[in-house]
Amino acid sequence: MSNISVIGTGSYVPNNIITNDFLSTIVDTSDEWIRTRTGILERRISKGENTIYMATESAKEAIKNANIEANDLDLIIVATLTPDNFMPSTACSVQKEIGAINALCFDISAACSGFIYGLEIACSMLKNSFRNKALIIGAENLSKIVDWEDRNTCVLFGDGAGAAILSKTKEEGILEFHSRSNGLKGEHLTCGALEANNIFNKDDMLKNNKFIKMNGKEIFRFAVGAMSETIYSIQEKTKWDLSEVKYIISHQANSRIIEYTAKKLNTNKDKFYMNLDKYGNTSAASIPIALDEMNKKGLLNKQDKIILVGFGGGLTFGGVAILWSI
């Protein structure tokens, strides 16, 4: 059976920077309050860029980085909870924009774990078919589902997109996954969709649930446990000691979650790459944005051992062990 490796990365974030100080002018908060509780200093917010645009720009970068053509792609998966349309899918729209005429395309919704889920689905599809190359994108326009009057949530989120290209290779690359879901606790992180109204049914149930709602304490507890479980499982499957792992690239939600997880794992927090201070929580986009940033900075070398780990609404969580191949 063929191995699967990451051969290219890309990302896009809006130019519009929203600082903590600016947010303190629209809600009752402060830079000190946000910074000490989350580690976030600023975030990028769309001024017209939609999910399709951001996903497309990240895809173009990844294609260029992988030194391939768009028509080499056999599969496009977009992980998003903020699509522009119910149909066509974001993936089909990206296909149109980049000219990937040979690709099978679809979206998945797994919130902040979406990129990890997308990688696992893509690996399975590549290994068990004629397909050779896949484009996985995490893209979010979270600013449109944030309640800008809720100081507990509006300070957390940002917009952006990140992408990775996978390919069948001779050398080892993507090694092991650990992915789980816990719908029993889904009520702790929610966002409503359409009101359940038609001419036969008038229902006000969803009218007050069109924005992100979060039980911060429960999500914090869940996140630390989920990240720890995932990393322990990946260690067991790969037989890696954490001292061998160059970086852990986690979902960029909150610096305190990462710090508590590092303590639980008895490892230095510096092993966890963090860029949430600049971008905030970009949900499914956070891991691929971080991965692309590291790739561009030259922080990763061939055969480096890295672990990606995500957690989010659903509740969902998962991770993957990778031998870096670029």
UniProtKB/Swiss-Prot annotation:
Protein localization: Cytoplasm
Disulfide bonds: none
Residues covered by region (ACP-binding): 252-256
TM helices/strands, residue ranges: none
Principal place of residence: cytoplasm
Range of residues in the leader sequence: none
Keyword terms of this UniProt record: Acyltransferase, Cytoplasm, Fatty acid biosynthesis, Fatty acid metabolism, Lipid biosynthesis, Lipid metabolism, Multifunctional enzyme, Transferase
CC per GO annotation: cytoplasm
Presence of the UniProt keyword Glycoprotein in the record: no
CDD domains the record matches: KAS_III (cd00830)
Metabolic or biological pathway, per its Swiss-Prot or TrEMBL entry: Lipid metabolism; fatty acid biosynthesis
Catalytic activity: malonyl-[ACP] + acetyl-CoA + H(+) = 3-oxobutanoyl-[ACP] + CO2 + CoA
MF terms in GO: 3-oxoacyl-[acyl-carrier-protein] synthase activity; beta-ketoacyl-acyl-carrier-protein synthase III activity
Keyword Transferase assigned: yes
GO biological process, one term: fatty acid biosynthetic process
Enzyme Commission number(s) of this protein: 2.3.1.180
Class of enzymatic activity (EC top level): transferase
Gene3D superfamilies (alphabetical): 3.40.47.10
Family, per entry: Belongs to the thiolase-like superfamily. FabH family.
UniProt note: domains: The last Arg residue of the ACP-binding site is essential for the weak association between ACP/AcpP and FabH.
PANTHER family membership: 3-OXOACYL-[ACYL-CARRIER-PROTEIN] SYNTHASE 3 (PTHR34069), BETA-KETOACYL-[ACYL-CARRIER-PROTEIN] SYNTHASE III (PTHR34069:SF2)
Self-association and partners: Homodimer.
Described function: Catalyzes the condensation reaction of fatty acid synthesis by the addition to an acyl acceptor of two carbons from malonyl-ACP. Catalyzes the first condensation reaction which initiates fatty acid synthesis and may therefore play a role in governing the total rate of fatty acid production. Possesses both acetoacetyl-ACP synthase and acetyl transacylase activities. Its substrate specificity determines the biosynthesis of branched-chain and/or straight-chain of fatty acids.
Name of the protein described by the UniProt record: Beta-ketoacyl-[acyl-carrier-protein] synthase III
Record organism: Clostridium botulinum (strain Okra / Type B1)
Chain's gene name: fabH
